[in-house]
């Protein structure tokens, strides 16, 4: 079978979530089919495996995206998998599997900052009702999502009549921490500073833990957010890395007591998988997606309560060696090879269903 993989969401430079998901799946595809990478810029190939066949098609932001099948039909593909749900399906002569990662933007409608104002306006309008999503998903032959939590929400909101397959998000393999790395009284937070991320509660928990605890915030931060959060904490209690490199982030994880997040809502939670994968326990808000990822290995807390955050960190500290070992085992559930296999099986079922 000849299968196209839509790689047009691969970022040039550093990955974001969709870009990393695409690259993780592509790098681990099983070898029982012929795969063709579909890109809109040759520079995207630098983030993808060498030597794979590829074709150039228009960008997903092109006005003609609803009719992109006109270009794809010429490639002689049996099927296409896209890591997004917005790939045009009209007029296609191949099986199509789309991806809906999560429904978080129906609850938190702020669009990505890098979008132009027309795209931001369209983004908000799209997420005001369910019918546009249903129209997109029902235009495919199958749908992939990255968690059982989101699969349940897709069913609850009756977003598609098509079969839904779970292909978990995962983290790239990284070296496990060693005793030589030590363990400091530091907590790591990886994520944005949007209101629903609730970073303020993490900061408010620091004085309850003690003056020797620090919170390391790894992502880029605006001056306004830096000033606001610094004012809530004592001097030096919060360290802003303002866009740490992957290696700097992993180094911080390997010496920390725990990764923490107090989000009220999340689409997934890749930082949890990244932390557990190197043997760093996690203490996180008690929401369904984090329960799915952390199982009985993570510590959970009420995200509205700084004292609950502090108590969860203390519980991690009291059983740290056991929590570290269990975290590594738990992270093994989230592997790109398994995700790629699930994607390909979804494509195979879609081709079979079309006859």
Name every feature range the model reports, one short phrase each.
Residues 1-355:
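Carbohydrate transferase catalytic cores enriched for Leloir-type hexosyltransferases
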């Amino acid at each position: 079978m000849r299968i196209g993989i839509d790689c047009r969401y691969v970022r040039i430079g550093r990955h974001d979530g969709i870009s990393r998901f695409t690259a993780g799946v592509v790098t681990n595809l099983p070898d029982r089919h012929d795969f063709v990478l579909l890109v809109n810029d040759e520079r995207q190939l630098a983030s993808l495996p060498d030597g794979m066949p590829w074709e150039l098609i228009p960008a997903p932001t092109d006005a003609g995206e609803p009719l992109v099948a006109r270009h794809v039909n010429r490639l002689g593909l049996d099927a296409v998998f896209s890591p997004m749900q917005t790939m045009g399906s009209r007029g296609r002569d191949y099986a199509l599997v789309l991806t809906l990662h999560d429904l978080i933007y129906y609850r938190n409608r702020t669009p990505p900052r890098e979008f132009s104002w027309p795209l931001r306006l369209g983004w908000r309008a799209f997420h005001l009702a369910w019918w546009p999503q249903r129209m997109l998903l029902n235009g495919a032959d199958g749908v992939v999502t990255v968690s059982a939590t989101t699969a349940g929400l897709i069913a609850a909101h009756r977003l598609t009549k098509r079969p839904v397959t779970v292909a978990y998000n995962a983290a790239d393999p990284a070296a496990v921490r060693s005793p030589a790395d030590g363990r400091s009284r530091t907590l790591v937070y990886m994520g944005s500073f949007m209101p629903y991320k609730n970073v303020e509660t993490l900061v408010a928990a620091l004085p309850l833990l003690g003056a020797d605890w620090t919170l390391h915030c790894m992502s880029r931060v605006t001056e306004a957010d830096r000033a606001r959060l610094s004012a809530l904490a004592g001097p030096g209690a919060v360290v802003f890395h303002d866009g740490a490199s992957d290696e700097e982030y992993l180094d911080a994880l390997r010496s920390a007591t725990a990764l923490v997040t107090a989000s009220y809502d999340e689409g997934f939670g890749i930082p949890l998988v990244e932390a557990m994968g190197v043997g760093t326990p996690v203490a996180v808000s008690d929401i369904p997606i984090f329960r799915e990822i952390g199982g009985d290995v993570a510590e959970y807390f009420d995200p509205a309560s700084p004292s609950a955050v502090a108590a969860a960190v203390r519980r991690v500290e009291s059983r740290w060696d056991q929590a570290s070992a269990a975290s590594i085992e738990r992270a093994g559930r989230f592997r790109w090879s398994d995700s790629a296999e699930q994607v390909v099986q979804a494509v195979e079922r879609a081709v079979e269903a079309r006859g």
